Every structure is written in structure tokens, then in C-alpha cells.
A protein has these predicted regions:
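…; additionally, a secondary subgroup of soluble metalloenzymes is captured
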Residues: 1-453, 462-612, 616-840
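Beta1/beta-strand and adjacent pyrophosphate-binding region of the FAD-binding site
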Residues: 456
């Protein structure tokens, strides 16, 4: 006998005899293994009495008559006799029995009763090794029922952190390979594989002949599909588990867990191939697929359906009341939908462009101006967003037809209407209509400011890009942003646009086409700084890229002592103006938005500057398709003319169909200039050798001439912000069905002071064990009305018996910090839930 075991027995006995009151402990040592050691045991506060098959009456007299006060260890080196042969049975009933075998000691330690002990005895080898035994003990089960002990043994062998059947199930699935399953083999070594399959039936309702892991995987996915799709092929019916609530809870937990997501994806792909699921589900109405999240092919089928509808120009198409943009937004947040986020973004924006197929332009320039900066600029933004997504596709060829349709509608139904309308009644007087003018920018936006003002001029940032920047800046709780439009100069190109933004009393273009500000040149940074400092001595000009590389102290020095600082940013035009990178111009737009927003935050935080104005010298036109010869206007200008694809400046106007002219004196508000600018009245270009053709500017269109002006004011210190909250709308007191739908509401719209977040919502028991599937809620809605922020969640409960006397809870956690944000107690009143069949 090992010393460890001997000491353990002595400690156990002494612990028992240390209790208050008299203690009689009967020890039936079946094989007499401890007969030679028992007398030497250093028992405290107890006597040792040897029981023999023939001294039962003598023992009874001793214990009950001769010495009724002392504690006794009654040791018998033989098995306990049957009741009818045991004259000490009545004494044993009010005494304690002691067992010294390892299982008995373990049961004594943990308080395991007879039924749990029987399970341990059957699988004694599992806890026969110290590491496994310690793992089993560490689970600290609340109750040692047969099911609980069996589950703990499964988890012990599978090396799970907790004793939940779902943990063992997940480990079995994760360990599976085409050739073997080490975890299941390990269970089989201890004859626990049959226990595992038994629990698959009792916990999940998985019962098939000759069960194996492949069939189990199929059952899990078929059961999930049957729940969301409602109708499944007959061949799949035998695999539908009888307890879908438990299956859904397990599948959601694995799918949404960052640690197991990749394994879930691999399992889903394998089952999808085995079932030929894509072909089977393709035969179902698409309405049935919109809530299915467990197989990647569902998103393929839905994006395919959307593509077909858009190619047919069916913008009224809907599934279950959701139109294509709504469906794209929701599906892009699902598990497999996130992997197709680019496709969904492309399709959502394609829908908006296709919806413009019947675009009607206002009648004249002034109405185009008003409608453009309020609404129509969004079409240009959506066109840009379409190509931003399209260019990220791994296999864009699948969407060639849709891309061609988008391109055709944008060019022939939108640009071909809005630009001619813009050039109808284009202002001919020096005031250029009633619009705010770019040439008055400094006097109206900068000159009157008492605080330091930083002006960021982003080359070619057209109005819709400025609107995106304004939206991004507005998300900062410390900023206030106001976006307004200004009418740029014509021709809408860099030299003239940059000049118009500087302080001046007179702007001029010489016969050699040089632009002067109050007789001063202004083509480069040094010249522009000289012009600016002439009006504001405490001012300066700097390139954006130079600021980016500066350390904090150097950056602060740029602004110290300055009243006005002009920062020149060149991301969009730098990419668009080069033939080999012009198709990257839309990507450059997003980069420009992000880096300008970041720079504003950096300057505000490091240079004690709180007022910023962001604007542009001009906008641009971009079309992806290759220009046809019919889109090009013959260049009849003399060689001395200033010729660009979108304008020609010369002493005389160009007399060509589709070309209009405007005196530069009108543009510059001067009476002395004798030059004339000629420009296409549509999206056409002049024939010019070399250079790119898709990205152009300089002409007369809303896209080229309406420039954004963002007035941004940052606040010192921190502004209090809150995270959006989740509110239960449905009246919830009792759950009476294994499948329940509840209405929730995001309590406030997302704003500069209310941050978005993600919630995980499910039901738990009083021990915090999850009893339902888990819903992932991305709370990012900006709708002002409560109805726009409401949504419905479906919960499927585990198929088991619920006690309507015990508390259960609906809980929600903020996924970013795991803080519980909602707990609502409910009564689970589901009659015989464990027996529900839920046939499919």
C-alpha cells in the first residue's frame, strides 16, 4: 500500500471522527487488503474494533451497552453481508460506512451518491490517472447525477475547460479529419464513445443508425437549415434532429465565436459539398433563404438573385418585404455575409444607379444647382461606391453584365441629362447667378475669423467626396461640421481654382494664360504664400505631405503665431491625372477623406487649433468606359490656344455643335480680360493627344464646378459620449414556446454623442448556462423615428425540461467589453418541452 494512499485513508477517518457527537464508522474491506495495517493507524478520538463473521452480537453489545459513548472504527476484512444475514444492519443505518477504494474515496471527497458512483466505477480508468482525476474534480459539478457525471467524464477525456456537453461535442468536431478523430478514439479507449452518442441523442435529438461524426455534422447543418428555410429536400429529412432548439444554440455559439469561426467555416463547406446544398437550395424560392446563415452558398444564391434582378432593371424586387439595399445591409452583417461584404456593397450601390435609369434633370442651371447639392450628388457618390467595391472583387467577370448596365445608365441616363441641363441658361453675368462663389471664398469664409483658421484645400475633392468627409467628421463628438456648396471657376482646373481661393481684389488671366492675383503669380507654394501673407502677414502655406511626416513639436511650430494657414492636399488629382492610375481615383477619394479627417484630429490635439475649413479647387468627372470617337469633339482651336480635354481658352470662342462659350471677364469679374473659355455642354471631351480620358476636369458640370466648403469647429477637452442601449419592446413575462420572437429597439440614433456597438442576446438559466441560440445585433441605426430602429429577434430554446418555479433570464451583453446591459427574468412554462418532436 502506498504511503500516499495510507495517509489519505487516515486523514479521511480522522476527519470523520473530529465531528461533533458520537461516530461509528463501519469499514467493510472486501479483500482484507488493510487487515495488517488497521491497528497501526494513528486514529484520533476513536477506538478500533475488529468485526468477524461470528462476533456480530458481541459487537452489538459492545457498541450499544458496554461502551455507548466512544467513537469506533469497526473494521471487517470481508464484504458486507446481505441484510438478512447482517445483525448490525440497524446500527449501520445510523452510522457511517467507509470505503477505501479510489472511486469510493473520490466519491467521499466530492459528495457523490450511489448513482454517480456507479458511473465512476464503470469508467474507473478515466479518473485512475492523476491529471484526468484532477480535471474531473475541478469541474465542481452542482449535482452528480448520472447524466452530469457522464458528461464530466466526456469532457475530462476531451480536455474541456468546463463540463458542458456542448464543449465535448465541439472538441469532437474540431478534432475530426478525413482519416481519423483522435478525440473520439480516446473516448473509445475508455468505452465512452457509446456514452457520447447516447448524449447526442438525449441532448440534440440526434438518433441515426450506426452514428458517426460525418452524419452528426450533416444533422447539425440540416437541422439548422430546417429551422431557417422551413422546407428541406426529402433526402435530408432523416438527418433532422428531434431537438432543434439545442442544435441551434450550439451552432450559433460555435459560428459566432472568434476562436471557432474558421473551423465552423471548414465544416460548413464540407457539409455543403456532401449535400450538394447549393443545387438543392437553388430549387427553393429565394424568400425562404433570407434568414439562413449556416451555409456559405446561401449568400451566393442571394447575391446571384440580386444580380439577375438588377440586370433586369427590376428595382422593385424584394424578398420578405426587404428591397435589395435593405437585404444587402442585413446580410452583410451575417457570418458568411461578412465574407461577401464587397459584393453586397457593390450590389447595394448598383441598385441606386439602376434606380436612376429614369432620372429627370431639372429644367435649367439654377434648379440643377439646388437639386444637385441636396440630392443628386448622391448618385455620383453611389457610382463611386459601386466601383470602389467592384474593383475589390476577386472575380469581377461574374458581374460584367451588371457593370455594363451601371455604366450605361450613369452615362446615358444621368450625365447625359444633368450636364446639358446645367449648361442651359448658364449665367453670363459677372455675378454668376445667386450662388455662393469660389472666388469670394477668402472674403466670406476666412477674412472675418478672429481665431486661427486652418484651410485645407484638397485638389479635385468634388462635392460628394466632401459630403462623405463631413459625415465622417460629424462622428467625432468634439466636432461641429457645416457643409455648404460653392460655385467654382470656369475653366475648372487647378491653377485658376487655387487662385480663386486666395485673398484678392483682382484675378486675371494673361494672354499667355498665366493666372495672376493682384498682379502676383500664384502657381507654386512659395508664390501662394506670398499672396496670402500680403493680406495676412501672420500666415503660411504648407504641403499636406510635409505635415504628415512631422513630429509633434515640429507640427506645433508650423501653426504657432499664425492667424491663417493654408494646407495643400493632393491625393485625388495626383492619381486621377495620370493615365496609368486614373482608375484608382475613387480609391484615392476614400483615402483623402480618411487622411484629412485624421490630420484635423491631429492638429486639433497637438497645435491648439480648433477651426478648420476644407474645400477644393475643382471637382472632376470620371467614367469607367472607354470613350467612343463620338464622345470627342474635334479641336478646331489655333495652336496658340490653351487646350484641355474639357475646355479651350482663346481669344475667340470655338464654333462647334455642343460647345458653349463664356467670356473670361465674366468668370473673373473683370472688364479688361479679352479671353473666352469654350466648353462642351455635355460630358464630351475635345480631341487632345496623350493623357488619360476617363478622369477629366476643367469643364462645366455640377461634378466639376460645385465644390464643397466644410466649416469644422473642434471643441476643447472631451465631450461626454454614450454607447447606444438596447431596449426590449415586447411584453415578456412567460415563455410558452420553444421558438419565440421578441421585438427590440435601439434606444437612440447613432450620432456624434451616441456610439454604435454590437450586442449578444440570449437566454440563460439561474446558473447562467445558455439555454437558447444567441443573436448578434449590430446597433448602428441612424433613423430618427423609433420605428426605424426597431427589429425582431428569434430565439430557439434547447429542448429540455424547464422548471416553471425557477428563474430564467433574457440577457444582453455589449460585445466590445462583455458588460451585461440587459437582464429580464422570465418564467419558462413549456409543457413537456423535452418530448417535443418538431418533425420536419
Amino acid at each position: 500500500m502506498s504511503e500516499l494512499k495510507y495517509n489519505q485513508i487516515v486523514d479521511k477517518l480522522n476527519t470523520e471522527f473530529a465531528s461533533e457527537g458520537r461516530r461509528l464508522v463501519f469499514w467493510y474491506d472486501d479483500n482484507g487488503y488493510f487487515a495488517d495495517d488497521v491497528d497501526a493507524m494513528p486514529l484520533q478520538n476513536a477506538k478500533i474494533w475488529h468485526l468477524t463473521p461470528t462476533n456480530q452480537f458481541r459487537t452489538k453489545i459492545l457498541l450499544e451497552r458496554e461502551d455507548p459513548q466512544s467513537n469506533y472504527l469497526i473494521y471487517a476484512p470481508f464484504p458486507k453481508p446481505p441484510v438478512e444475514q447482517n445483525h448490525l444492519e440497524d446500527t449501520i443505518l445510523y452510522s457511517k460506512q467507509f470505503h477505501a477504494d479510489p472511486i469510493s474515496l473520490l466519491c467521499s471527497d466530492l459528495g457523490i451518491g450511489a448513482e454517480g458512483k456507479a458511473v465512476l466505477q464503470k469508467y474507473a480508468k478515466v479518473v485512475g490517472e492523476q491529471t484526468r482525476k484532477q480535471r474531473f474534480c475541478d469541474y465542481k459539478l452542482a449535482a452528480y447525477t448520472v447524466d452530469a457525471v457522464e458528461t464530466a467524464l466526456l469532457c475530462t477525456v476531451c480536455k474541456c475547460r468546463t463540463a458542458q456537453f456542448e464543449d465535448a461535442l465541439r472538441e469532437i468536431l474540431l478534432a475530426d479529419t478525413p482519416d481519423a478523430n483522435p478525440k473520439l478514439d480516446e473516448l473509445a479507449k475508455y468505452k465512452l464513445d457509446e456514452v457520447f452518442w447516447k448524449h447526442c441523442e438525449t441532448e440534440l435529438g440526434f438518433a441515426v443508425p450506426a452514428p458517426n461524426v460525418d452524419k452528426l455534422k450533416i444533422s447539425l447543418f440540416v437541422t439548422s437549415l430546417a429551422h431557417s428555410v422551413k422546407v428541406i429536400p426529402d433526402a435530408w429529412q432523416p438527418f433532422a434532429a428531434a431537438k432543434p432548439g439545442s442544435v441551434l444554440a450550439f451552432m450559433d455559439g460555435m459560428m459566432n465565436n472568434v476562436n471557432y469561426g474558421d473551423a465552423f467555416d471548414a465544416m460548413a463547406a464540407a457539409v455543403q459539398d456532401t449535400l450538394h446544398a447549393k443545387a438543392a437550395l437553388a430549387k427553393l424560392p429565394h424568400d425562404l433563404l433570407t434568414d439562413c446563415e449556416c451555409l456559405p452558398c446561401v449568400d451566393d444564391l442571394l447575391t446571384g438573385w440580386m444580380t439577375e434582378r438588377l440586370q433586369a432593371e427590376d428595382v422593385t424586387a424584394a424578398l420578405n418585404g426587404e428591397n435589395i439595399p435593405e437585404l444587402c445591409q442585413r446580410r452583410a452583417k451575417t457570418h458568411f455575409g461578412r465574407k461577401l461584404a464587397v459584393q453586397y456593397a457593390m450590389l447595394e450601390n448598383a441598385w441606386h444607379i439602376v434606380s436612376a435609369a429614369h432620372y429627370r434633370a431639372p429644367a435649367d442651371y439654377e434648379h440643377v444647382w439646388a437639386q444637385y447639392y441636396r440630392e443628386d450628388y448622391k448618385i455620383d457618390a453611389q457610382y463611386r461606391a459601386f466601383y470602389t467595391a467592384y474593383d475589390k472583387l476577386d472575380e469581377p467577370a461574374a458581374y460584367d453584365k451588371l457593370q455594363g448596365l451601371v455604366e450605361n445608365i450613369y452615362n446615358t441616363e444621368y450625365l447625359a441629362k444633368i450636364i446639358p441641363a446645367w449648361n442651359t441658361d448658364f449665367p453670363q453675368e459677372p455675378g454668376m447667378g445667386r450662388m455662393a462663389l469660389q472666388r469670394n471664398f477668402f472674403s466670406e469664409c476666412v477674412a472675418g475669423n478672429k481665431e486661427r483658421t486652418v484651410v485645407i484645400i484638397s485638389d479635385a475633392m468634388r462635392y460628394e467626396v466632401g459630403a462623405e468627409l463631413a459625415a465622417l467628421l460629424a462622428e467625432d463628438p468634439k466636432s461641429t461640421v457645416q457643409l455648404t456648396p460653392r460655385l467654382g471657376v470656369l475653366p475648372s482646373y487647378t491653377r485658376l481654382g487655387m487662385a480663386a481661393l486666395l485673398p484678392h481684389t483682382r484675378m486675371e488671366m494673361t494672354p499667355e494664360y498665366q493666372v495672376l492675383i493682384d498682379d502676383m503669380p500664384c502657381e507654386n507654394l512659395a508664390q501662394r504664400q506670398a499672396v496670402l501673407q500680403k493680406r495676412v502677414p501672420q500666415s503660411g502655406c504648407i504641403q499636406f505631405d510635409d505635415l504628415k511626416s512631422m513630429k509633434k513639436d515640429d507640427l506645433r511650430a508650423v501653426f504657432t503665431g499664425k492667424q491663417v494657414v493654408y494646407i495643400y492636399h493632393n491625393q485625388i488629382d495626383a492619381r486621377g491625372d495620370k493615365p496609368n492610375t486614373e482608375d484608382e481615383v475613387f480609391a484615392a477619394c476614400r483615402e483623402a477623406v480618411e487622411e484629412i479627417a485624421a490630420m484635423i484630429r491631429r492638429i486639433a490635439g497637438s497645435a491648439n487649433t480648433l477651426h478648420f475649413i476644407v474645400t477644393a479647387d475643382h471637382g472632376f468627372l470620371y467614367k469607367r468606359h472607354t470613350l467612343a470617337e463620338s464622345d470627342k469633339i474635334p479641336n478646331t482651336a489655333p495652336k496658340t490656344a490653351f487646350v484641355n480635354r474639357r475646355f479651350i481658352v482663346d481669344a475667340d470662342p470655338i464654333a462647334q455643335p455642343g460647345v458653349a462659350s463664356l467670356p473670361m471677364a465674366t468668370v473673373l469679374n473683370t472688364k479688361t480680360n479679352t479671353l473666352t473659355v469654350s466648353y462642351p455642354t455635355a460630358a464630351n471631351v475635345f480631341k487632345v493627344a496623350g493623357g488619360g480620358e476617363n478622369y477629366v476636369h476643367g469643364g462645366s458640370s455640377p461634378q466639376e464646378m460645385i465644390v464643397p466648403v466644410l466649416d469644422v469647429r473642434m471643441e476643447k477637452g472631451r465631450m461626454e459620449t454614450t454607447t447606444v442601449q438596447l431596449t426590449l419592446v415586447s411584453i415578456l413575462k412567460k415563455i410558452t414556446n420553444l421558438i419565440t420572437a421578441l421585438d427590440f429597439m435601439q434606444n437612440e440614433p447613432i450620432s456624434d454623442t451616441v456610439r454604435e456597438t454590437t450586442f449578444r442576446v440570449h437566454f440563460v438559466g439561474e446558473d447562467n448556462e445558455r439555454i437558447s441560440n444567441e443573436n448578434i445585433v449590430v446597433a448602428d441605426k441612424r433613423g430618427e423615428t423609433a420605428a426605424e430602429r426597431m427589429f425582431r429577434l428569434r430565439f430557439s430554446f434547447k429542448n429540455r425540461k424547464y422548471d416553471n418555479k425557477k428563474p430564467y433570464y433574457l440577457v444582453a451583453y455589449d460585445d466590445k467589453n462583455s458588460v451585461e446591459v440587459l437582464r429580464r427574468q422570465v418564467v419558462m412554462d413549456i409543457a413537456m418541452a423535452d418530448d417535443f418532436g418538431f418533425g420536419f
